[in-house]
């Protein structure tokens, strides 16, 4: 299974969103050598004013794979971006994990992951996706969702029109 979360994936996501002229949001990116490090999201109001909404920070490993996506939200009362949550990506031979950690403002640090999603190769053109959530009362994780995702492979269809 090859990594699907690369610099090119993040760049494509940004350009697809930014080029939709009818979208209610506007995007501003920090792009350096074809690599997106930050995206700011603003909502377009009816009076053509822009309202800050979200800010995303991206980090990559030496292979160009996404390792961290930090999400910040705009705090209107403080007039500044504040940490919200973080996705951390860990890559393995047969897939990758995505861990979600929430920001603890009292500790000024991210908590231990509250959710972990495992993406694993399950066969040709198939990926197993399992999500585990933290059970706070028992201090362990439980399986909350499991599915198989199949890629469309038109060349392997048995019938044609």
Residue ranges of each PLM-predicted region?
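Buried hydrophobic residues that stabilize the cores of well-folded domains
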Residues: 11-161
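Sec-dependent signal peptide recognition
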Residues: 1-10
């Amino acid at each position: 299974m090859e990594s699907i979360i690369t610099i090119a994936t993040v760049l494509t996501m940004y350009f697809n969103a930014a080029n939709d002229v009818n979208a209610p949001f506007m995007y501003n990116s920090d792009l350096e050598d074809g690599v997106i490090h930050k995206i700011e999201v603003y909502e377009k109001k009816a009076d053509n004013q822009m309202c800050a909404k979200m800010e995303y920070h991206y980090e990559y490993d030496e292979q160009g794979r996404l390792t961290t996506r930090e999400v910040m939200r705009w705090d209107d009362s403080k007039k500044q971006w504040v940490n919200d949550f973080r996705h951390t990506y860990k890559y393995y031979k047969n897939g990758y994990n995505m861990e979600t950690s929430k920001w603890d403002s009292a500790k000024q640090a991210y908590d231990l992951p509250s959710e972990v999603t495992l993406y694993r190769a399950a066969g040709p053109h198939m990926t197993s996706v399992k999500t585990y959530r933290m059970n706070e009362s028992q201090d362990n994780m439980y399986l909350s969702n499991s599915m198989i995702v199949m890629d469309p492979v038109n060349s392997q269809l048995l019938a044609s029109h």
